[in-house]
Curated annotation (Swiss-Prot):
GO BP of this protein: cytoplasmic translation
PROSITE patterns listed in its UniProt record: RIBOSOMAL_L6_1 (PS00525)
Subunit structure: Part of the 50S ribosomal subunit.
One Gene Ontology cellular component: cytosolic large ribosomal subunit
InterPro entries (UniProt xref): Ribosomal_uL6-like (IPR000702), Ribosomal_uL6-like_a/b-dom_sf (IPR036789), Ribosomal_uL6_a/b-dom (IPR020040), Ribosomal_uL6_bac-type (IPR019906), Ribosomal_uL6_CS (IPR002358)
GO MF term set: rRNA binding; structural constituent of ribosome
Keyword RNA-binding: yes
Keyword entries, A-Z: Ribonucleoprotein, Ribosomal protein, RNA-binding, rRNA-binding
Keyword Metal-binding: no
Role according to the record: This protein binds to the 23S rRNA, and is important in its secondary structure. It is located near the subunit interface in the base of the L7/L12 stalk, and near the tRNA binding site of the peptidyltransferase center.
Similarity comment: family membership: Belongs to the universal ribosomal protein uL6 family.
Gene: rplF
Protein name from the UniProt record: Large ribosomal subunit protein uL6
């Protein structure tokens, strides 16, 4: 039995969960999210009001989908109650970020500024010219836009310049030794 999949997902007060067949919809103080659960997996409510995810049998595919489905449903509940935030930072001389309206404008050593528009449900916040955060209720969207931003200028293994997640350790390489 999946150790993650068998745990019920607690539903906090103020969160409304609707289950219609394979579709799970969660409405909370921060917004509404929905998920289409894979076919053999069954999602239901138990007596205490928690969400329970079960599988019909122990086939390999069903076992792998069991824990995944439970985690995705738990992410919906956490997203509409607390939301998700990814903090990022920029290293490098002349590298900086600014908020223009709702867009992020990066100066990353290219001949032009790079502008990133937030997708629906995502907000940007700039704390300093080298630190910013990506926030939203959908964990997948927050992670995806953070990865797209990081890809604009990946951290350099020799000098460490680039966009990175806060606290991310970059493997540094030793440069060539001079004669």
């Amino acid at each position: 039995m999946s150790r993650i999949g068998k745990q019920p997902v607690p539903v906090p007060a103020g969160v409304d969960v609707t289950i219609e067949g394979q579709n799970v919809s969660v409405k909370g103080p921060k917004g509404t999210l929905s998920l289409a659960v894979a076919e053999p997996i069954v999602v239901a409510r138990d007596d205490e009001g928690a969400i329970v995810v079960t599988r019909p049998n122990d086939e390999r595919r069903n076992r792998s989908l069991h824990g995944l489905s439970r985690t995705l449903v738990a992410n919906l509940v956490e997203g509409v109650t607390q939301g998700y935030t990814t903090k990022m930072e920029i290293y490098g001389v002349g590298y900086r970020v600014a908020l223009k309206g709702s867009n992020l404008e990066f100066a990353l050593g290219y001949s032009h500024p790079v502008v990133i528009e937030p997708p629906e449900g995502i907000t940007f916040a700039v704390e300093t010219p080298t630190k910013f955060s990506v926030s939203g209720i959908d964990k997948q969207k927050v992670g995806q836009i953070s990865a797209i931003i990081r890809r604009l200028r990946r951290p350099d293994p020799y000098k460490g310049k680039g966009v990175r997640y806060e606290g991310e350790q970059i493997r540094r390489k030793v440069g060539k030794t001079g004669k």
